[in-house]
């Protein structure tokens, strides 16, 4: 191939959006001071932080006082989920079987939880949370197969149980659904800088700090605010939302093409809902092929893709998401498109994939 490597792993981290880069460079010389201080530099930093919060609130259609900047999406997940659990005072966390490991680890830390099953598309298969649930954790869309969840519908039948929504995979790409009490998002997933997460807590939600508080601007999250990074994250989110319809339609058409052509390869299964899904990603599994070997060979040919869930790939364990769905767990590839992905890049990937799969199968005698 020509033109350098093709990055097809935007679901792990989207390249920095031009709006984020421009804003970050400009803010580095202005947002360094402590926004709690009353001197001029501190007041300037506070104004910048408040502006970032207002931009995020408008982009996500929430109130500015419902927005808290955190140091990562994982921290936002832990704060949001465990804060609702603590606010409920008793009961057990319930979570869908396809949640990100950040949710699973938080539930374990809180004493364990109840797993809610999903169907073969990865969608929650129950109408109401189990008895004794303190908080129900359901992602807005799955980070591995893209299937969206009926968040508003689940909330309507939750019987007063608060709902925590992990929106890290979808924020900016899809409008936030209704019905949640707290939610989390991650800047680098939409083209903002890494190291910035969003904790969203609805006005009136029964949320209490699950960890020691800090006397900062916003007591929901501890630590010194990274004002330049927060501004850059807000600028990227604003830009991504503004271009969402055009970019999303283009990505959806490209992914539709991938789903169709990949399914033509013998013994390949495409996972997730083909329609109600994130526009930019698709996961498929190849029987008789090792996922790590497939990713390595594709990388050698210039195509960067992922295998398995990002939360389990480093441990070389099968994807708990695919296992919960009852589909193939090995030999899987997740392809996810950047905002500027081109038809030629996708075509190039699809041209080399069949021969790579055939060669790897031949090496193991299948």
Protein language model regions, located:
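Pyridoxal 5′-phosphate
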Residues: 1-366
């Amino acid at each position: 191939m020509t033109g350098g490597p093709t990055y097809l792993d935007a679901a792990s981290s989207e390249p920095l959006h031009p709006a984020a880069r421009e804003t970050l460079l400009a803010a580095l010389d202005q947002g360094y001071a402590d926004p709690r201080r009353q001197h001029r530099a501190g007041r300037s930093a506070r104004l910048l932080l408040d502006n970032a919060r207002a931009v995020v609130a408008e982009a996500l259609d929430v109130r500015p006082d419902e927005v808290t900047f955190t140091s990562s999406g994982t921290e936002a997940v832990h704060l949001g989920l465990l804060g609702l659990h603590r606010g409920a005072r008793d009961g057990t966390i319930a979570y869908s079987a396809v949640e990100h490991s950040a949710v699973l680890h938080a539930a374990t830390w809180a004493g364990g939880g109840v797993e809610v099953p999903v169907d073969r598309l990865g969608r929650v298969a129950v109408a109401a949370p189990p008895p004794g649930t303190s908080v129900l954790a359901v992602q807005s869309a799955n980070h591995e197969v893209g299937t969206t969840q009926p968040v508003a519908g689940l909330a309507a039948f939750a019987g007063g149980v608060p709902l925590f929504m992990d929106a890290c995979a979808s924020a900016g790409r899809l409008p936030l659904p209704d019905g949640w009490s707290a939610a989390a998002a991650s800047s680098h997933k939409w083209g903002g800088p890494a190291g910035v997460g969003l904790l969203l807590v609805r006005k009136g939600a029964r949320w209490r700090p699950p960890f020691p508080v800090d006397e900062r601007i916003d007591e929901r999250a501890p630590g010194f605010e990274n004002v330049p990074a927060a501004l850059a994250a807000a600028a990227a989110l604003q830009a991504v939302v503004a271009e969402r319809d055009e970019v999303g339609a283009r990505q959806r058409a490209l992914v539709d093409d991938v789903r169709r052509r990949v399914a033509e390869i013998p013994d390949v299964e495409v996972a997730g809902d083909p329609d109600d899904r994130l526009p930019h990603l698709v996961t498929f599994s190849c029987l008789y092929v090792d996922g790590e070997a497939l990713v390595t060979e594709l990388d050698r040919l210039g195509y960067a893709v992922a295998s398995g869930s990002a939360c389990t790939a480093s441990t070389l364990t099968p994807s708990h998401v695919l296992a919960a769905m009852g589909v193939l767990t090995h030999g899987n590839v997740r392809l996810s498109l950047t905002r500027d992905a081109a038809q030629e890049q996708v075509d190039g990937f699809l041209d080399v994939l069949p021969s790579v799969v055939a060669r790897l199968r031949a090496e193991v005698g299948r």
